[in-house]
């Protein structure tokens, strides 16, 4: 289902300083492997010097590992242990052994001290290593660190092997979706920019494709009878195949793709439908298709898909919740204020698995008003997937390169409330603690676009570590009242 997301094969390398018992490090390595219950490849080479380091890296490469745990079973050899990250092409986590599994004479490893030298040497060599919040622990503790590291590594590997394919340019008066490509290259992401006309030519070339009937049947099965426009299926299936073939034919040296596509105003009339439902289907398979050529929205979605190993979406931070609705359905039932809530909306790109059971393919009301005759039945503005979003824990986040070329990000955890919106599109009532202050002093103050990515679960801890590893210096979050923002007026 998620062929567009990396599979992490994790290797475990133990290191040992030659003045400490090597057997201590090896015993502790074996205990970690046992605690992981087969979830890691245990490298048999213990690293004491640079030649050992080269042998260990060759061994984990031969085993197919694409991420590593470098384990300081004792103080560790600071030069060879840190050079592992230079010679191994993948993310490395550095962790250290806690004492307590032996006496404090021959059984003391001093890895607590060795981790300091490890960090110092990584810095001197300008090498990146992931170090957990508290990197010292027992075998069971480190097994838990490893379980957190796997989705982090998945996202890092994905980003380093990602190509974002765009069909644009962005709609007029949509400068909020600006996307300086400098930040993409800093992150190691490739981008292929195409015109909407390129997409149309490819779409027309897929007319009569022999695979269309099978895709139509899959769409029927997904939606259920009465939940789709039968006369639209072939057009939408043709478009889905167009995108999938383009991804396969254009990913080039990269392994993974995401799209950022123009979807209005010309698209519906020229293609004959709105692309939202098709976009939602690709997103459910780990291939984000960001609306309105939002390149950093696509990147954000892809990172969230890697971390959560689940479908994600991209929504407008759209409208306030009416006070009357808050009073009737939220106040007293949930521990939120009115300004903690807002509605997240998009025309219809959220995967069906994240919507309420009454979801259906409908038409885009705003585009119908704009593009089709008043009073007419919707025609080419059909194709949106609409319903209230199902109640869920969520993480609202974004990684963005701003107009000055600086990478910034934000992360806020909250939930989608089980409250009917009474509105149209793919829409839900979101609640995030202290959203009002976050909205003013992060989203507005730092000039973020109106699109935010949504992961369906609480993934703030993992996203924070990924953004930090990628070198993002500004990682904002919804700060509690006890921690004012720098721009917050203390007299207000």
Q: Where are the model-predicted features located?
A:
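N-terminal basic/disordered segments at the start of proteins
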Residues: 1-36
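Cap/lid and interdomain-hinge subdomains that line or gate substrate/regulatory clefts
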Residues: 3, 8-10, 38-40, 100-228, ...
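Periplasmic-binding protein-like
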Residues: 65-74, 93-95, 256-261
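Short, acidic/small-residue loops that bind anionic groups at enzyme active sites
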Residues: 83-110, 117-123, 128, 280-293
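Long, internal scaffold/assembly segments composed of regular secondary structure
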Residues: 216, 221-307
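C-terminal catalytic subdomain
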Residues: 283-421
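Extended hydrophobic packing segments that form well-structured cores
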Residues: 365-492
């Amino acid at each position: 289902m998620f062929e567009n997301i990396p599979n992490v094969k994790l290797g475990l390398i133990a290191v040992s300083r030659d003045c400490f018992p090597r057997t201590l490090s090896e015993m502790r390595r074996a205990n970690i492997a046992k605690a992981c219950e087969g979830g890691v490849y245990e490298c048999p080479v213990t690293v004491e010097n640079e030649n050992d380091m080269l042998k260990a890296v060759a061994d984990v490469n031969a085993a197919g590992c694409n991420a590593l745990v470098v384990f300081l079973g004792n103080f560790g050899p600071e030069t060879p242990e840190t050079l592992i990250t230079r010679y191994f092409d993948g993310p490395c986590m550095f962790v250290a052994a806690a004492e307590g599994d032996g006496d404090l004479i021959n059984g003391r490893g001093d890895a607590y001290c060795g981790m300091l030298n490890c960090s110092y040497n990584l810095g001197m060599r300008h090498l990146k290593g992931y170090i957990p919040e508290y990197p010292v622990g027992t075998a069971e503790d480190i097994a838990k660190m490893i379980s957190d590291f796997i989705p982090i590594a998945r996202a890092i590997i994905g980003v380093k092997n990602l190509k974002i394919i765009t069909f644009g340019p962005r709609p007029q008066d949509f400068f909020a979706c600006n996307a300086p490509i400098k930040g993409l290259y800093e992150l190691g992401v490739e981008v292929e920019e195409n015109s909407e006309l390129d997409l149309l030519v490819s779409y027309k070339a897929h007319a009569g494709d022999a695979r269309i009937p099978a895709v139509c049947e899959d769409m029927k099965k997904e939606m259920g009878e009465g939940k789709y426009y039968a006369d639209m299926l072939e057009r939408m299936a043709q478009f889905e195949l167009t995108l999938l073939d383009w991804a396969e034919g254009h990913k080039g040296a990269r392994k993974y793709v995401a799209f950022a596509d123009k979807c209005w105003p010309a698209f519906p009339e020229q293609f004959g439908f709105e692309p939202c439902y098709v976009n939602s289907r690709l997103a459910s398979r780990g291939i984000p298709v960001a609306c309105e050529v939002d390149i950093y929205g696509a990147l954000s979605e892809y990172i969230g898909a890697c971390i959560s190993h689940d479908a994600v979406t991209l929504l407008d931070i759209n409208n306030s919740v009416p006070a009357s609705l808050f009073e009737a359905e939220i106040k007293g039932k949930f521990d939120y204020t009115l300004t903690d809530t807002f509605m997240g909306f998009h025309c219809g790109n959220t995967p069906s698995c994240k919507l309420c059971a009454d979801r259906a393919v409908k038409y885009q009301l705003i585009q119908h008003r704009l593009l089709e005759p008043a009073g007419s039945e919707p025609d080419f503005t059909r194709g949106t997937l609409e319903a209230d979003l199902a109640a869920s824990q969520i993480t609202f986040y974004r990684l963005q390169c701003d107009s000055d070329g600086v990478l910034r990000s934000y992360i806020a955890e909250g939930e989608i409330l089980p409250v009917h919106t009474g509105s149209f599109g793919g829409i839900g009532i979101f609640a995030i603690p202290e959203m009002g202050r976050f909205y003013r002093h992060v989203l507005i103050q730092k000039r973020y676009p109106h699109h935010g990515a949504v992961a369906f679960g609480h993934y703030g801890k993992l996203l924070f570590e990924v953004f930090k590893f990628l070198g993002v210096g500004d990682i904002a979050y919804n700060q509690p009242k006890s921690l004012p923002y720098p721009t917050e007026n203390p007299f207000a």
